[in-house]
């Protein structure tokens, strides 16, 4: 009798994706983040579902409903802080996952990579709308500033912004629709994740050497299931440490003040995981230019496969490209720091230089380094 694991139409799909999946024998801990992202998504959907049972998306009661969750609902504070800090863990894993793809040349699986970029945009949109829901000061002003950026679009900009707002300012209609979309998008993301995995399993995983590993594959279970569980425990340890010891460390104190359209906070800034893009936006004095730079800072990932000039796939054996990669990582950390600082000297000029460097490294310096390494290796 055939094993049900291999014959049942549904269980067979799970088996081929997570149990008998052939995986390269040499993939490192950098390949753990895909499964961690899946767990983060499941955690966010679960905690979000329970929070939605107690939350009200009305401008008069939204802030107090979040307070009610924290004070009166059984373990409501755990749910709220798991959800808020779970988003931070989600983005840490996301950025490390993208960084791994850049370093090891995984972007040459174009369909998987492009699907990943779409997923990144979807997760960013979801996180932005989620930040608006507690209806604190930073929620309200963040929503106002970011949605207002669309008014930079020529001709239709103003109409588009008012259409998104559902009125002439961020108000009840905006909050209600943001809640609806924030609830819906994670399920769309789940579907996109399945497409992402479908494309990945068409080609199989890349590995640290960048050399095809068809000759040396091992089953995903038990080797990588146990490895992923170790990564999961480490992530849960960090997440629970955040939630139980310093739940507000990554948040903004201004969000503990109810939204007030008549009082602008001194420094409007998004959550830490958007600061690098916010710094790029602010570094350009022109509104439309800033918006374009903001969108391109993420959209540039789409063209990375076409900028690959090296004869080698991975950066493992390319020291010049490695130095540039870590320079890019340092540059992104600098941009993240600048995004949280006020718009004054010397932060403005540092932000502008870091923004120029970001685009220069990706568009020009890295492709040139690839060509140079080919020449050095007499290829």
Curated annotation (Swiss-Prot):
<dbReference type="GO" id="GO:0006122">
    <property type="term" value="P:mitochondrial electron transport, ubiquinol to cytochrome c"/>
</dbReference>
<dbReference type="InterPro" id="IPR027387">
    <property type="entry name" value="Cytb/b6-like_sf"/>
</dbReference>
<protein>
    <recommendedName>
        <fullName>Cytochrome b</fullName>
    </recommendedName>
</protein>
<keyword id="KW-0813">Transport</keyword>
<keyword id="KW-0472">Membrane</keyword>
<dbReference type="GO" id="GO:0005743">
    <property type="term" value="C:mitochondrial inner membrane"/>
</dbReference>
<keyword id="KW-0496">Mitochondrion</keyword>
<dbReference type="GO" id="GO:0008121">
    <property type="term" value="F:ubiquinol-cytochrome-c reductase activity"/>
</dbReference>
<feature type="transmembrane region" description="Helical">
    <location>
        <begin position="33"/>
        <end position="53"/>
    </location>
</feature>
<dbReference type="Pfam" id="PF00032">
    <property type="entry name" value="Cytochrom_B_C"/>
</dbReference>
<feature type="binding site" description="axial binding residue">
    <location>
        <position position="196"/>
    </location>
    <ligand>
        <name>heme b b566</name>
    </ligand>
</feature>
<feature type="transmembrane region" description="Helical">
    <location>
        <begin position="113"/>
        <end position="133"/>
    </location>
</feature>
<keyword id="KW-0479">Metal-binding</keyword>
<dbReference type="InterPro" id="IPR030689">
    <property type="entry name" value="Cytochrome_b"/>
</dbReference>
<comment type="subunit">
    <text>The cytochrome bc1 complex contains 11 subunits: 3 respiratory subunits (MT-CYB, CYC1 and UQCRFS1), 2 core proteins (UQCRC1 and UQCRC2) and 6 low-molecular weight proteins (UQCRH/QCR6, UQCRB/QCR7, UQCRQ/QCR8, UQCR10/QCR9, UQCR11/QCR10 and a cleavage product of UQCRFS1). This cytochrome bc1 complex then forms a dimer.</text>
</comment>
<feature type="binding site" description="axial binding residue">
    <location>
        <position position="83"/>
    </location>
    <ligand>
        <name>heme b b562</name>
    </ligand>
</feature>
<keyword id="KW-0679">Respiratory chain</keyword>
<dbReference type="InterPro" id="IPR005798">
    <property type="entry name" value="Cyt_b/b6_C"/>
</dbReference>
<keyword id="KW-0830">Ubiquinone</keyword>
<dbReference type="InterPro" id="IPR048259">
    <property type="entry name" value="Cytochrome_b_N_euk/bac"/>
</dbReference>
<feature type="transmembrane region" description="Helical">
    <location>
        <begin position="226"/>
        <end position="246"/>
    </location>
</feature>
<dbReference type="GO" id="GO:0045275">
    <property type="term" value="C:respiratory chain complex III"/>
</dbReference>
<keyword id="KW-0812">Transmembrane</keyword>
<keyword id="KW-1133">Transmembrane helix</keyword>
<dbReference type="Pfam" id="PF00033">
    <property type="entry name" value="Cytochrome_B"/>
</dbReference>
<feature type="binding site" description="axial binding residue">
    <location>
        <position position="182"/>
    </location>
    <ligand>
        <name>heme b b562</name>
    </ligand>
</feature>
<dbReference type="InterPro" id="IPR005797">
    <property type="entry name" value="Cyt_b/b6_N"/>
</dbReference>
<feature type="transmembrane region" description="Helical">
    <location>
        <begin position="178"/>
        <end position="198"/>
    </location>
</feature>
<feature type="transmembrane region" description="Helical">
    <location>
        <begin position="77"/>
        <end position="98"/>
    </location>
</feature>
<keyword id="KW-0999">Mitochondrion inner membrane</keyword>
<dbReference type="InterPro" id="IPR016174">
    <property type="entry name" value="Di-haem_cyt_TM"/>
</dbReference>
<keyword id="KW-0349">Heme</keyword>
<feature type="transmembrane region" description="Helical">
    <location>
        <begin position="320"/>
        <end position="340"/>
    </location>
</feature>
<feature type="transmembrane region" description="Helical">
    <location>
        <begin position="288"/>
        <end position="308"/>
    </location>
</feature>
<feature type="binding site">
    <location>
        <position position="201"/>
    </location>
    <ligand>
        <name>a ubiquinone</name>
    </ligand>
</feature>
<keyword id="KW-0408">Iron</keyword>
<keyword id="KW-0249">Electron transport</keyword>
<dbReference type="InterPro" id="IPR048260">
    <property type="entry name" value="Cytochrome_b_C_euk/bac"/>
</dbReference>
<comment type="function">
    <text>Component of the ubiquinol-cytochrome c reductase complex (complex III or cytochrome b-c1 complex) that is part of the mitochondrial respiratory chain. The b-c1 complex mediates electron transfer from ubiquinol to cytochrome c. Contributes to the generation of a proton gradient across the mitochondrial membrane that is then used for ATP synthesis.</text>
</comment>
<dbReference type="InterPro" id="IPR036150">
    <property type="entry name" value="Cyt_b/b6_C_sf"/>
</dbReference>
<comment type="similarity">
    <text>Belongs to the cytochrome b family.</text>
</comment>
<dbReference type="GO" id="GO:0046872">
    <property type="term" value="F:metal ion binding"/>
</dbReference>
